[in-house]
Each structure stands twice: as structure tokens, then as C-alpha cells.
């Protein structure tokens, strides 16, 4: 790589901190007990992104959000930081290791390029592939020596895949291991059938290697081993490469083993099928210990699917790995490695790989509620702050790229009750002005992960009935209720309906509820297994009892789309209407009992681009029909509306009224409901969005959503003004 001039972030560091951060670290001790103040400040993730693009088989970097191992930012704008110019000119499966003295790093990788079969077909590259690994050296993870190609496999090997290394104190050498197919000596053209075995060799300098030996040969193909040491035992995780069959049910998943000797050929079995049930298949495992607690992470590559999926455990010997529920990895990471880094290394990496010479790479401030949101295209930084944070003398720390300067300096105290301007000047004199805004963040409205909120004013209080979110495949089973006197402070009333014990016809997929009241009874409409049920109670807090013992709206009938997302609107004359649907929108008048309807009166009212989440209100004689468009997993999920003369329409589409606001980290805004403060013309929209990222907070996506609130206003002509999604939410509402 081109040499770089080192620039550390503009941070005011005390002498003590400088001493701690500049002291050379030792090798990461996987068996170290939990410590309150780790010498490591975060993690570096080196990876490739696959053979689907021309530069996908080159090495990329991502950096964790501090010591949060599940939330990451891409460095260098997601572009490669190391590219290969020799051998097969492709780099896969990068692995980075710190020397035992902590003064050097080695990066090794597979010499292979499969983009448009550059190196050949998958069969060919295992018969006549590279016998070498790629090697780089560095003292700082930024400046690397020229790459070198080092032969490690024997002459009869057909490939050299996914090299990794581990320092062995007893040997005083690195043990380097990889997968190879070995062909018979009398088969020089490698035409016979064989399978991958795990090989190893030792080295002190990654230049000269011992003669390779077979390390793991269970009698069938295995690849992609990774190792971590805890106390006196080495734990090895390897992909079972066999084709799935009744005799090998754990094929294409990970096997865990352990040994007190790293180079032993007889590891003890710990567990197999690791990853099964949470992913379709897995390879490329990388294992590492948490910097701050007794916990280990195992990232497994769901190749052909989502890419890396994180798992975690607090007991390596148990063999039990639990899928991490909240994470945000880089875009499309494939087989790579995670390395703990010190604060000095962390800062250096941030500065070395900005998106542009005038970028602000990151920012932090005391009393932040979530991670800073840096929007390169808008030259804007948003600091989500705690609701009671004092903004008058805030002194945020800002990182800029190497060779750049910042004015005013990072750490300068300023009054952030209004957004502040900073100027970044690159080494060539180019300048860019950035806006930094600190926002008191009252969002989310409800604690934890909640989606599809249905809000109503009942018995002198505001009530919200949401989907309990955060489950893979939206597989939750319980509904809760929350109430408030002011739309800001909410009481959790606990579980009001549990599908398992309370519903006989469904056990899971508890989604998108709705509430309605009639004659002192409360009717709770809910989704379960893509059908709509109804339960009844004497209080909005429940407990609710299934009213029918069967679905009110069943799947499998003549109606198109999914039978989900109920919503009830009651007109001034007392007639209640049930709206529902995914893909197609429907409405039907409910009978007086609120638990039945005349199926012949069902109407299809599907507007253009309708997805789901119907909701209807009435204001000044006009009916407003609202719904969500796109997919709840998309950051572009949004709300549109139409107006009409009756609850049944006809409807005239008016446009979008709620959509993402990415410069504030607000994405996936949708599946809303609306409430009016009685006796006023004040309206509020309650909706979900992707969860905000922050220390100990989930990363947002279509299964990790938070419920929030903003004002909804009308123009003089009765149209709805676009709702501006905010982090602030609303102030307490008093009647």
C-alpha cells in the first residue's frame, strides 16, 4: 500500500491515559477473566464480501462501536483497504494475528479469485489451485509491507484454503492451519477423488514454515477451522463439509472440539450442528472473546444467505451457542477475523480510513443515548443525547482523517442548544463545513422493542397495544398493553394475551393488534399465524379472553393476500368497521357483537402500492384512510393516505405523510396509528421505526423496531401535512 502519514484524532488525553494507550499490548488472552477496565477499546473486523463483484475478493475493514462487538462501522467507505496484485489476484478469508510481544501484526489470506471463475470452477480450484498463502506484516494495522506469496502446502495439494494462525507458547511458534485436498503421488494431474483435510505447519516469521502435517482428518471433508484458548484448553470450530444426508444431519454446519495441545490430532468432541436452527448453512467461523466480560462470540457465515450471523456463549465447554438478537454488521461480510484493538489503534484506524479527506469520521459526547449519526452526503453529525442532557457546555470529540485539521478543535466546549459549525481542512487545503447537532432524545416511547402500535384514548388515558418485537421471523407469542396520561410517561400493564395458554388455534406470530370499545367491553383484535382473532375483556388492561375459539378472519379462503393487521374504526353513528390485509386491503362493517360480520359485505379497497397497516380516522366530516407501503424490513417503509366521503370510500390517494429521515438515523418508519386529544384538534401519530443504535441498545432492522410518536397536523384545506419524524418525540400533553 501507499505509505500514509499518521494522524491521531484530536483528543485531549491525560498523561495517564496516554501511558495506558501507548504501552505495547500483549497477545489477546482469550482466557483472561473479566476486567472492569479493559486495555482494549474495540475490535477490528477484516473480511471480504464475496465473488459477486470485481472487488469483492479483496480485504475490507470495519471497526466496532467501542467495545460493542455486535455493532460496526465500515472503514474506507466500504472499499477495499488491501488488494492483491500477485498470484490469483484475489483475497479471501483474511486472518489477522497480533504477535505475542504486541509489536507486530501478520495478515494472511487465501490466494483465490472466483469472480467470473477467474481461477477456474470450484472443482478446478480444488484440484489445481494455489499451494500458497498471502502474507503481509504491519506494526500499526494501517501501514503494511508489500504482500508476499508463501508456499505452505505439499506438492500433492490441490488447494490451500482459509489459513489461520495461533501462537503456541509451548512451541514458541505460530501454528498456521488451513484446508487442502491431498492427491495420491501417482496422480500428478489430480484427477482422482479426495476430500479436504485440515493441515498445519509452524513458523516464527511467516517466511519459513515447517513441513506441513495433517491436523484433522475425520474421514470426510472439513474446512475453515478457527481456534480460541481458554485456560489450558484450545477450542476448535470447523465446518463439516459433507453433503447433508440422514447419516450426516450436521453437514454444512460447525463442529466444536477441544484439546490441551494445539497441534493434537485427537481433539475431544464438544458439540456439532452449531448454527443449525438459526441459519440455513454455515461456514467460515471466527471466534473471539469479549473485551469486557466472560463471553465469547462466534460469527458464522451463512453463505448464499445473510453472510455472517453472530452467536454467543458464556461457557465454551457447554457447546451451546445462542444467536445474538441485536446486531448490525458491515454490508455483506464474508469469512474474516475479529481482532481486539487498543484505544490508540482504534483511533489510528478511524483516522486512516475516512470516506473523504474532509470527512468527520465519528463523534462522541458525554450523556449520549445512542451512537452518533454521521451523514457524509449532508456534512452533518447528529448526537442523540439523553433527555435531560445539558447542552450548554457540551464538548464533543470529533475524529477527522489523517492530515486534516478541525476548527474549532475537538473537545472545545460550545453551546449546543443550537447546531454548531465545524470546518475540516484537508492536507491539500480543501475545506468543508460540517453541522453538528445535539438532540435530546425522548424516543423510543415504550421501553424495549415494540412495533405496529395501535393507540387509542380510553377511560381518560392513552393506551398503546404493540407487537412485542425482537424475535427472529417475528415469532413472538405475547401481547402487552401500555397506558399514559400525557403521551410521554407510560405504564406497562404486562401481558394481556399469551397465545400459548390463551388461544387454542394458534401458538405463535403474535402481530399487529388493535383495540375497540363498546358498551363497557373492550375488544382486542390480534394476528396469530397469519389469521385474525378477537378477545374480550372488561378493562383495557385485560386480561383478555379469546371470544370465539377460532379465527375471526381465517387464512386459506377466497381473499387474496395475508389475513393480518386488523384495525377498527367506529363512526359517529356507532357503526364499527374492521380493516385488515397485507398485499390487499379489506373493510367490512362489524356486527353489533363486535366479534362477527357478514362475509358478503367484505370490500376490497386496495390502493396503489398498498402493503399493510390500515388505519382510519374522521375529521370535520372527512374520512382518512392510511396505510404502509414497501416492506417493514426496508428502510424505505413509509405511510401514505387517501381521503373519502365514508368509511368505505371511495378513496382518493393523497400521497406520503411519513417517511425515513436518515440524517437522524430514523429509518423504516411505518405501521402507524393516530390519536386525537379529546376536545382539541391536536393529533398525534404513533409509529415504529428501526431501533436506534447505542451502547447496549439493539441495532435496528425489520425485526428490531421501536415505537415512537410525533405530532400530525392538517393544512387549511384538510390535507395532512407531512409528519416530520424526530428523535425528540413530543412533550407531555395536558388536557
Where is each model-derived feature located?
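Small side chains
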Residues: 15, 256, 363-365
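Short, intrinsically disordered low-complexity segments
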Residues: 1-3, 91, 212, 412, ...
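Beta-rich interaction/scaffold domains
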Residues: 355-441
Amino acid at each position: 500500500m501507499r505509505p500514509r502519514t499518521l494522524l491521531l484524532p484530536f483528543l485531549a488525553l491525560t498523561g495517564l491515559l496516554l501511558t495506558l494507550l501507548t504501552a505495547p499490548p500483549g497477545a489477546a488472552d482469550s482466557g483472561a477473566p473479566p476486567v472492569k477496565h479493559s486495555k482494549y477499546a474495540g475490535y477490528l473486523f477484516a473480511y471480504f464480501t464475496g465473488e459477486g463483484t470485481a472487488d469483492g475478493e479483496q480485504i475490507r475493514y470495519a471497526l466496532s462501536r467501542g467495545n460493542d462487538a455486535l455493532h460496526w462501522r465500515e472503514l474506507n467507505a466500504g472499499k477495499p483497504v488491501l488488494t492483491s496484485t500477485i498470484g490469483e489476484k484475489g483475497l479471501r478469508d483474511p486472518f489477522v494475528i497480533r504477535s505475542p510481544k504486541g509489536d507486530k501484526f501478520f495478515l494472511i489470506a487465501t490466494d483465490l479469485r472466483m469472480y467470473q471463475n477467474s481461477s477456474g470452477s470450484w472443482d478446478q480450484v480444488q484440484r489445481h489451485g494455489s499451494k500458497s498463502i498471502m502474507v503481509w506484516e504491519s506494526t500499526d494495522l494501517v501501514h503494511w509491507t508489500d504482500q508476499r506469496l508463501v508456499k505452505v502446502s505439499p506438492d500433492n495439494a490441490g488447494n490451500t484454503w482459509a489459513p489461520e494462525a495461533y501462537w503456541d507458547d509451548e512451541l514458541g511458534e505460530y501454528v498456521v492451519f488451513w484446508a487442502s485436498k491431498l492427491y495420491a503421488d501417482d496422480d500428478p494431474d489430480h484427477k482422482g477423488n479426495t476430500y479436504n483435510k485440515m493441515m498445519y505447519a509452524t513458523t516464527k516469521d511467516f517466511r519459513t514454515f515447517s513441513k506441513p502435517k495433517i491436523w484433522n482428518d475425520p474421514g470426510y471433508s472439513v474446512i475453515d477451522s478457527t481456534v480460541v484458548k481458554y485456560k489450558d484448553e484450545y477450542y476448535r470450530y470447523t465446518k463439516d463439509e459433507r453433503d447433508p444426508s440422514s447419516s450426516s444431519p450436521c453437514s454444512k454446519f460447525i463442529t466444536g472440539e477441544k484439546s490441551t495441545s494445539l497441534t493434537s490430532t485427537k481433539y475431544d468432541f464438544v458439540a456439532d450442528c452449531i448454527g443449525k436452527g438459526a441459519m440455513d448453512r454455515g461456514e467460515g467461523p471466527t471466534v473471539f472473546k469479549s473485551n469486557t466480560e466472560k463471553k465469547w462470540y462466534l460469527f458464522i457465515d451463512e453463505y448464499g444467505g445473510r453472510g455472517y450471523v453472530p452467536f454467543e456463549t458464556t461457557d465454551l465447554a457447554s457447546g451451546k451457542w445462542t444467536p445474538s438478537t441485536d446486531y448490525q454488521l458491515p454490508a455483506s461480510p464474508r469469512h474474516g477475523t475479529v481482532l481486539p484493538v487498543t484505544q490508540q489503534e482504534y483511533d489510528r484506524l478511524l483516522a486512516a480510513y475516512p470516506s473523504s479527506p474532509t470527512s468527520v469520521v465519528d463523534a462522541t459526547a458525554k450523556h449520549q443515548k445512542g451512537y452518533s449519526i454521521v451523514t457524509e452526503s449532508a456534512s452533518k453529525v447528529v448526537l442523540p443525547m439523553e433527555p435531560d442532557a445539558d447542552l450548554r457546555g457540551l464538548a464533543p470529540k470529533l475524529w477527522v482523517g489523517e492530515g486534516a485539521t478541525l476548527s474549532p478543535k475537538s473537545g472545545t466546549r460550545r453551546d449546543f442548544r443550537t447546531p454548531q459549525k465545524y470546518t475540516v481542512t484537508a492536507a491539500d487545503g480543501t475545506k468543508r463545513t460540517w453541522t453538528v447537532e445535539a438532540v435530546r432524545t425522548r424516543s423510543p416511547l415504550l421501553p424495549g422493542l415494540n412495533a405496529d402500535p395501535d393507540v387509542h384514548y380510553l377511560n381518560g388515558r392513552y393506551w398503546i397495544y404493540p407487537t412485542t418485537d425482537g424475535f427472529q421471523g417475528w415469532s413472538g407469542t405475547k401481547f402487552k398493553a401500555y397506558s399514559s396520561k400525557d403521551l410521554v410517561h407510560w405504564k406497562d400493564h404486562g401481558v394481556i394475551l399469551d397465545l400459548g395458554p390463551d388461544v387454542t388455534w394458534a401458538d405463535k406470530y403474535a402481530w399487529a393488534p388493535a383495540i375497540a370499545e363498546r358498551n363497557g367491553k373492550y375488544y382486542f383484535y390480534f394476528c396469530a399465524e397469519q389469521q385474525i382473532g378477537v378477545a374480550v375483556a372488561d378493562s383495557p388492561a385485560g386480561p383478555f379472553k379469546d371470544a370465539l375459539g377460532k379465527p375471526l378472519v381465517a387464512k386459506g379462503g377466497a381473499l387474496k393476500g395475508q389475513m393480518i393487521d386488523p384495525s377498527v374504526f367506529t363512526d359517529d353513528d356507532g357503526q364499527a368497521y374492521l380493516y385488515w390485509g397485507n398485499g390487499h386491503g379489506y373493510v367490512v362493517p362489524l356486527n353489533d357483537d363486535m366479534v362477527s360480520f357478514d362475509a358478503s359485505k367484505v370490500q376490497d379497497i386496495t390502493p396503489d402500492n398498498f402493503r399493510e397497516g390500515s388505519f382510519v380516522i374522521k375529521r370535520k366530516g372527512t374520512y382518512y384512510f392510511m396505510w404502509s407501503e414497501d416492506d417493514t424490513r426496508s428502510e424505505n417503509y413509509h405511510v401514505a393516505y387517501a381521503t373519502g366521503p365514508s368509511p368505505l370510500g371511495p378513496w382518493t390517494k393523497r400521497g406520503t405523510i411519513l417517511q425515513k429521515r436518515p440524517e437522524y438515523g430514523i429509518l423504516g418508519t411505518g405501521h402507524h396509528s393516530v390519536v386525537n386529544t379529546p376536545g382539541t384538534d391536536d393529533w398525534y401519530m404513533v409509529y415504529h421505526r428501526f431501533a436506534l443504535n447505542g451502547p447496549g441498545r439493539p441495532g435496528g432492522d425489520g425485526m428490531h423496531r421501536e415505537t415512537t410518536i410525533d405530532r400530525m397536523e392538517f393544512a387549511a384545506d384538510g390535507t395532512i401535512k407531512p409528519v416530520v419524524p424526530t428523535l425528540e418525540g413530543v412533550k407531555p400533553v395536558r388536557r
